[in-house]
Amino acid sequence: MSVSIKPLEDRIVVRPLEAEQTTASGLVIPDTAKEKPQEGQVVAVGPGRVAENGNRVPVDVAEGDVVLYSKYGGTEVKVGGEEYLVLSARDVLAVVTK
C-alpha cells in the first residue's frame, strides 16, 4: 500500500499495528490503559542518507516489512484519516519475520 507521504533521507513511514485488545483471560483493555504500539508495517521508505563520501547509504527495511521500533521514537502524523509514524531508520530495532 502506498501512502501520499514521501519520506526523505533515511526516514520511513510506518502504520502502527494495534496490540491485542483483550488479555489471555478475556478481559478487555480500555484505551486509557493501552501501551503505545511498538510494532508496525512499513508503508514508505526514503532513498537513504548520503554518506560523507557522497555515496547514498540505502535503508535496511522495505515497504511491507513489519518492524519493531523505539517506544517514543518518530513523529505521529495523520494522512487521509489514518495515523502514521515517521521514523528515522535508526529508531527501527528489528524486522519481524513470521
UniProtKB/Swiss-Prot annotation:
Which InterPro entries did the record assign? Chaperonin_GroES, Chaperonin_GroES_sf, Chaprnonin_Cpn10_CS, GroES-like_sf
Respond yes or no to whether keyword Membrane is given for this record.
no
A Gene Ontology CC term for this entry? cytoplasm
Query: From its record, what is one biological process in GO terms?
Result: chaperone cofactor-dependent protein refolding
- Please report which protein family the annotation says this sequence is part of: Belongs to the GroES chaperonin family.
HAMAP family the UniProt entry points to: CH10
**Designated name of the protein:** Co-chaperonin GroES
